[in-house]
Design a protein with these regions (language model features):
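STAS-typified acidic loop motif
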Residues: 141-157
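Conserved PDZ fold ligand-binding element
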Residues: 74-98, 176-179, 254, 262
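A short, well-ordered alpha-helical element
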Residues: 154-174
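Terminal peptide-recognition signature
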Residues: 16, 20, 53, 74, ...
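Conserved acidic, small-residue-rich alpha-beta core segments centered on
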Residues: 185-287
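PDZ domains, with a preference for the canonical peptide-binding region formed by the helix
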Residues: 84-116, 190, 269-270, 275-277
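Extended, small/polar residue-biased N-terminal targeting/export presequences
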Residues: 2-62, 112-113, 120-127
């Protein structure tokens, strides 16, 4: 009703709405103002602009690749963890701070950037085009096992995870380390899609109970091919929550002793939220 009352302070109105929607019984029901709604939506999208890597600075002040996000421009060009980036075009990494480098990359979205990097002491040059990438799935192939790091569950996580599993399958990998530490969840449908890449078709991924006590079953999706693993080791901690816990439950229920969980007890969130967007850009998330 704020638009029907003249000169009503918008901040006061937001505080009133926030007070009405904040429940001690359910900390997951929230009203988001414009800034909070944008931040929440961005966190679910998992979308970033860049080369598709995370990195750290070494003693030479060069940028060492720590992770390469699957399906990104860096991934498509074959960059790997421990590659040491020396320069981007004429911009030397050792002479610039990380903020300058990141700004340069973002400013050249859609344009060729010449990258010089070291791998095992040998210098290489390649052209990368900074662009949009999903920052939720990292896939590494090691001697005898594969590692997939899943940071959250975005709209694209399911297909990116499927691509990662295909990569492990092509490499003949039969042991998977699935890192879900600090994964706070995201889209439940993404957990459904990811489960479908690991468990048999027609398997139950999870059951939902509505407010009337009615149960519905969600089954593994047919369009995702199961890649069989001889052993799956899941890494979890106290910040592993929501959709990540659904995924762990689906794997343990359907694959039994094939799955081993390692780490501390997960967060323990078994409820699903729905987000309702409003025309002014704010939104309401409720259980």
């Amino acid at each position: 009703y704020s638009n029907k009352i003249k000169n009503l302070d918008s901040k006061l109105m937001e505080q009133a709405i926030d007070g009405m929607t904040t429940l001690d019984q359910d900390v997951h029901t929230n009203y988001f103002d414009l800034e909070q709604a944008r931040a929440f939506s961005s966190s679910l999208e998992g979308s970033n602009v860049g080369l598709g890597i995370s990195f750290y600075l070494n003693e030479s002040k060069n940028f060492v690749v720590s992770n390469v996000y699957i399906n990104s421009t860096a991934d498509k060009k074959g960059l790997k963890p421990q590659d040491e980036i020396i320069s981007l075009d004429d911009l030397k990494c050792s002479e610039n701070d990380s903020d300058t480098i990141i700004k340069y990359i973002k400013a050249h979205e859609g344009q060729n950037v010449k990258i010089k990097y070291l791998r095992d002491g040998k210098e290489y040059t390649t052209n990368l085009i900074p662009g949009t990438f999903d920052s939720t799935v990292v896939c590494n192939v090691y001697e005898g096992y594969g590692e997939i790091i899943l940071t959250s569950f975005s709209e694209n996580s399911g297909k990116d995870f499927s691509k990662a599993m295909s990569r492990l399958q092509e490499a003949g990998i039969k042991k998977l380390v699935l890192d879900l530490r600090n994964n706070g969840g995201g889209y439940l449908n993404a957990a459904l899609e990811i489960s479908s890449s690991l468990i048999p078709k027609k398997s139950v991924v999870f059951k939902e109970k509505d407010k009337d006590g009615k149960f519905t079953k969600e089954m593994a999706k047919d369009e995702f091919n199961q890649v069989k693993m001889g052993k799956i080791i899941v890494l979890q901690n106290e910040n592993t929550a929501s959709a990540a816990e659904v995924l762990i439950g689906a794997l343990k229920d359907n694959l039994g002793d094939t799955v081993i969980t390692v780490g501390t007890t997960s967060y323990g969130k078994g409820t699903e939220q729905v987000t309702v967007p409003f025309s002014d850009g704010t939104s309401f998330k409720y259980t």
